[in-house]
Swiss-Prot record:
It comes from Bacillus subtilis (strain 168). The keyword Coiled coil applies. Residues 1-31 form the signal peptide. It comes from the Bacteria. Keywords: Coiled coil, Signal. Residues 57-89 form a coiled coil. This is Uncharacterized protein YfkI.
Length: 106
């Protein structure tokens, strides 16, 4: 149990040190500041208008569902193509073998 805590402590210390070092880079600092301001603005916007948050979440969930359906259809299509390929491959191999035998006899 103590080793797990030491490892966890080391992970957090490493992350904190990495964050501190990355903030020495001026463009990174500026980008973090801009993101922080954007986040604060969105938070205050959603706090004052919870219906907007609800609508945004619903929209994002609908987009995710649509994407999942599209991916599912594409995976089904690929699986169907693989099945057809598995069916036709032995026939093609047999045809190639027959052609090879025919021309090797001559």
């Amino acid at each position: 149990m103590n080793n797990e805590r030491l490892m966890l402590k080391g992970i957090f210390l490493g992350a904190a040190a990495g964050a501190a070092l990355s903030l020495l880079h001026k463009p990174t600092r500026q980008a973090c500041g801009m993101r922080w301001l954007t986040c604060k603005h969105k938070l205050s916007l959603y706090k004052s208008n919870p219906e907007l948050l609800k609508n945004t979440v619903i929209t994002k969930v609908d987009e995710a569902k649509k994407l999942a359906r599209t991916l599912s259809k594409e995976v089904d299509f690929v699986n169907q193509q693989v099945k057809e390929l598995k069916k036709t491959t032995p026939q093609v191999m047999e045809l190639v073998q027959e052609t090879k035998e025919h021309f090797s006899k001559k």
